[in-house]
Amino acid sequence: MKTMEAIIRRLPVKGVDGSLELIELDAIFYLEAGEGDTLIRTKRKKPYRSVQRLHELAKRLPAPAFVQCHREYIVNLNRVRALTPRGSRDWDLRLDPPVNRRIPIARDRLVDIYKILGL
C-alpha cells in the first residue's frame, strides 16, 4: 500500500480569496515570502498568492527537492539551471525558463545546497 506522502503530489494552498488551490509540486519553481502572504511561482504568468506563511508551506514540501535558500525563498532544485556568482562571496540560483529568475542564496545556506547537489 502506498503512503499518503507518495500519493499526494500536490501542495494545498489557501488563497487570499478563501479558495483552496492544489498545485502540482513539479510545477513549482519557487516560493517567496511577501508582506502577509506567500507568492508561489509556476509557469503561469500570474503567481499564486497564499495567506499561509513561508515557514508553514515549507513543512509540506518534500526535502531535498525543495530547499530554503534564503529567509524569503524556497526553491525547487529540480527547476534550477545554474549557480551563478554575484560579487566575490555571494551566489544566486538561476531558474529554468520560462521563469528565468535569479534567486539569492544566503551565505549560511550555501554549504547545505552544495551538499544536496553533490558538489
Q: What would you call each of these model-derived segments?
A:
Residues 2-119:
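Basic, polyanion-interacting recognition surfaces, primarily
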